[in-house]
């Protein structure tokens, strides 16, 4: 009797969405690291921007729902040193604001609304890197673009969110240099 109760509890635990998501992310990670992989991995550029604004949490969530393997997001640093998702140097194209990301504080950026692919305003706001990583955690790999030059800031957030193993980061230096640094 005790054994059957244990098995039922174990099954209930294993069927929880968080557990299954973590299993999925780890499987994707193994695929990424497999040099002999014989299948194609699907990457959503700036999330699923056809459904939600690019580089938004909603675009990441949509990519996860579509069972995409990797989501590519772009990072910029604000005037007060916070990391936000934004492809362009400026906020003009993707929000209802104007100016450069580096000239705005996080509070100013959080007041803005993101535009959809057709330029219409949405209810979505510009997410921080931390918000994006927490949305992706355990469910999908994340390819961080425009992040290498702010590596220390990015890595601190990866450590804080426990997502370092789920991130791919591009850089302009040879692997040997990166390992030394």
Predicted region positions:
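Bacterial Sec-dependent N-terminal signal peptides
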Residues: 1-25
